[in-house]
Amino acid sequence: MATPAYMSITGTKQGLITAGAFTEDSVGNTYQEGHEDQVMVQGFNHEVIIPRDPQSGQPTGQRVHKPVVITKVFDKASPLLLAALTSGERLTKVEIQWYRTSAAGTQEHYYTTVLEDAIIVDIKDYMHNCQDPGNAHFTHLEDVHFTYRKITWTHEVSGTSGSDDWRSPVAG
Protein backbone atom coordinates (compact mmCIF):
# COMPACT_ATOMS: atom_id res chain seq x y z
CA MET A 1 0.00 0.00 0.00
CA ALA A 2 1.25 3.48 -0.89
CA THR A 3 2.03 5.90 1.92
CA PRO A 4 0.00 9.13 1.77
CA ALA A 5 1.63 12.54 1.55
CA TYR A 6 0.59 15.64 3.49
CA MET A 7 0.02 19.10 2.03
CA SER A 8 -0.22 22.62 3.45
CA ILE A 9 -1.61 25.57 1.48
CA THR A 10 -1.16 29.27 2.22
CA GLY A 11 -3.19 31.87 0.31
CA THR A 12 -2.93 35.64 0.03
CA LYS A 13 -6.51 36.21 1.25
CA GLN A 14 -7.30 33.25 3.52
CA GLY A 15 -3.88 32.63 5.07
CA LEU A 16 -3.26 29.00 6.06
CA ILE A 17 -6.14 27.36 4.17
CA THR A 18 -5.28 23.94 5.61
CA ALA A 19 -5.37 25.06 9.28
CA GLY A 20 -7.18 22.35 11.25
CA ALA A 21 -7.88 20.32 8.10
CA PHE A 22 -6.59 17.02 9.50
CA THR A 23 -8.30 17.06 12.89
CA GLU A 24 -10.94 14.67 14.22
CA ASP A 25 -13.72 17.22 13.59
CA SER A 26 -12.56 17.61 9.99
CA VAL A 27 -11.86 14.02 8.88
CA GLY A 28 -13.30 11.76 11.58
CA ASN A 29 -11.48 8.55 12.41
CA THR A 30 -8.67 9.01 9.86
CA TYR A 31 -7.15 11.81 11.99
CA GLN A 32 -3.46 11.45 12.90
CA GLU A 33 -1.46 13.59 15.32
CA GLY A 34 1.28 15.76 13.92
CA HIS A 35 -0.47 16.71 10.66
CA GLU A 36 -3.33 18.84 12.02
CA ASP A 37 -2.70 21.80 9.68
CA GLN A 38 -2.25 19.71 6.54
CA VAL A 39 -4.49 17.70 4.23
CA MET A 40 -3.79 14.06 3.53
CA VAL A 41 -2.95 13.54 -0.15
CA GLN A 42 -4.49 10.26 -1.34
CA GLY A 43 -3.36 10.57 -4.96
CA PHE A 44 -0.92 12.68 -6.97
CA ASN A 45 -0.26 13.27 -10.66
CA HIS A 46 2.09 15.72 -12.38
CA GLU A 47 3.84 15.88 -15.74
CA VAL A 48 6.63 18.07 -17.06
CA ILE A 49 7.34 17.61 -20.76
CA ILE A 50 9.42 19.08 -23.55
CA PRO A 51 7.57 19.00 -26.89
CA ARG A 52 9.44 16.98 -29.48
CA ASP A 53 9.22 16.41 -33.20
CA PRO A 54 7.89 12.85 -33.72
CA GLN A 55 10.24 12.24 -36.68
CA SER A 56 13.55 13.60 -35.43
CA GLY A 57 13.00 13.51 -31.68
CA GLN A 58 14.38 17.05 -31.47
CA PRO A 59 12.80 19.56 -29.08
CA THR A 60 10.23 21.85 -30.73
CA GLY A 61 9.47 24.21 -27.88
CA GLN A 62 9.86 25.21 -24.26
CA ARG A 63 9.20 22.93 -21.31
CA VAL A 64 5.55 22.52 -20.39
CA HIS A 65 4.42 22.10 -16.79
CA LYS A 66 1.00 20.51 -16.66
CA PRO A 67 -1.13 21.11 -13.55
CA VAL A 68 -0.27 19.31 -10.33
CA VAL A 69 -3.33 17.23 -9.46
CA ILE A 70 -3.90 15.89 -5.95
CA THR A 71 -6.73 13.70 -4.68
CA LYS A 72 -7.99 14.27 -1.15
CA VAL A 73 -11.02 13.53 0.99
CA PHE A 74 -13.60 16.18 1.83
CA ASP A 75 -12.37 18.03 4.91
CA LYS A 76 -12.44 21.43 6.60
CA ALA A 77 -10.29 22.89 3.81
CA SER A 78 -12.65 21.81 1.00
CA PRO A 79 -14.95 24.88 1.07
CA LEU A 80 -11.90 27.14 1.40
CA LEU A 81 -10.24 25.54 -1.63
CA LEU A 82 -13.42 26.09 -3.65
CA ALA A 83 -13.46 29.73 -2.49
CA ALA A 84 -9.82 30.08 -3.58
CA LEU A 85 -10.73 28.61 -6.99
CA THR A 86 -13.76 30.84 -7.59
CA SER A 87 -11.98 34.02 -6.45
CA GLY A 88 -8.69 33.28 -8.24
CA GLU A 89 -6.80 33.58 -4.95
CA ARG A 90 -3.03 33.43 -5.36
CA LEU A 91 -1.45 30.74 -3.22
CA THR A 92 1.93 31.90 -2.00
CA LYS A 93 3.01 28.40 -1.03
CA VAL A 94 1.74 24.86 -1.53
CA GLU A 95 3.99 22.32 0.20
CA ILE A 96 3.65 18.56 -0.16
CA GLN A 97 5.64 16.42 2.26
CA TRP A 98 6.20 12.85 1.10
CA TYR A 99 6.69 10.00 3.59
CA ARG A 100 8.07 6.48 3.38
CA THR A 101 8.97 3.68 5.75
CA SER A 102 12.60 4.05 6.84
CA ALA A 103 15.06 1.18 7.28
CA ALA A 104 14.25 1.38 11.00
CA GLY A 105 10.57 0.75 10.23
CA THR A 106 9.31 4.24 11.10
CA GLN A 107 7.68 6.88 8.91
CA GLU A 108 10.15 9.47 7.64
CA HIS A 109 9.63 12.68 5.67
CA TYR A 110 12.01 12.04 2.79
CA TYR A 111 10.84 14.26 -0.09
CA THR A 112 9.22 17.69 -0.50
CA THR A 113 7.50 19.39 -3.42
CA VAL A 114 6.88 23.15 -3.11
CA LEU A 115 4.78 25.25 -5.48
CA GLU A 116 5.10 29.05 -5.35
CA ASP A 117 2.66 31.60 -6.77
CA ALA A 118 0.15 28.86 -7.47
CA ILE A 119 -3.54 29.06 -8.28
CA ILE A 120 -6.25 26.43 -8.26
CA VAL A 121 -7.55 26.00 -11.81
CA ASP A 122 -9.99 23.10 -11.35
CA ILE A 123 -11.67 21.11 -8.59
CA LYS A 124 -13.61 17.94 -9.27
CA ASP A 125 -15.73 16.64 -6.36
CA TYR A 126 -16.99 13.08 -6.65
CA MET A 127 -18.39 10.06 -4.88
CA HIS A 128 -18.03 6.52 -6.17
CA ASN A 129 -21.24 4.55 -6.67
CA CYS A 130 -22.12 3.56 -3.10
CA GLN A 131 -24.34 0.69 -4.33
CA ASP A 132 -21.29 -1.08 -5.79
CA PRO A 133 -19.76 -3.33 -3.09
CA GLY A 134 -16.35 -2.85 -4.73
CA ASN A 135 -16.47 0.81 -3.72
CA ALA A 136 -17.20 0.17 -0.03
CA HIS A 137 -13.82 1.53 1.10
CA PHE A 138 -14.13 4.83 -0.85
CA THR A 139 -15.33 8.06 0.71
CA HIS A 140 -16.14 11.48 -0.77
CA LEU A 141 -13.16 12.69 -2.77
CA GLU A 142 -11.96 15.70 -4.69
CA ASP A 143 -9.25 16.29 -7.26
CA VAL A 144 -7.59 19.70 -6.93
CA HIS A 145 -5.58 21.04 -9.90
CA PHE A 146 -2.83 23.62 -9.30
CA THR A 147 -0.77 25.66 -11.75
CA TYR A 148 2.24 27.60 -10.49
CA ARG A 149 5.10 29.93 -11.31
CA LYS A 150 7.83 28.00 -9.52
CA ILE A 151 8.28 24.41 -8.40
CA THR A 152 11.03 22.98 -6.19
CA TRP A 153 11.71 19.30 -5.61
CA THR A 154 13.87 18.30 -2.62
CA HIS A 155 15.05 14.86 -1.55
CA GLU A 156 15.35 15.60 2.17
CA VAL A 157 17.32 12.49 3.11
CA SER A 158 19.87 12.65 0.27
CA GLY A 159 20.15 16.45 0.26
CA THR A 160 19.48 16.96 -3.47
CA SER A 161 17.09 19.45 -5.05
CA GLY A 162 15.97 20.94 -8.34
CA SER A 163 13.58 23.69 -9.35
CA ASP A 164 12.02 25.51 -12.28
CA ASP A 165 10.78 29.10 -12.32
CA TRP A 166 8.95 30.61 -15.29
CA ARG A 167 10.60 33.99 -14.58
CA SER A 168 14.07 32.51 -15.03
CA PRO A 169 15.19 31.23 -18.44
CA VAL A 170 16.62 27.74 -18.50
CA ALA A 171 20.41 27.79 -18.84
CA GLY A 172 21.56 25.96 -21.94
Swiss-Prot record:
Specify the superkingdom: Bacteria
Indicate where this protein resides in the cell.
Secreted
Give an example GO cellular component term for this record: extracellular region
Q: Which UniProt keywords apply?
A: Secreted
Q: Does the keyword Glycoprotein apply?
A: no
InterPro entries per the UniProt record, alphabetical = Hcp1-lik_sf, T6SS_Hcp, T6SS_Hcp1_domain
Q: What is its main location?
A: secreted
Which Gene3D superfamilies does the annotation name? Answer: Hcp1-like
- What Pfam families does the entry give? T6SS_HCP
Q: Would you identify the family this protein belongs to, as annotated?
A: Belongs to the hcp1 family.
Q: What is this protein called?
A: Major exported protein
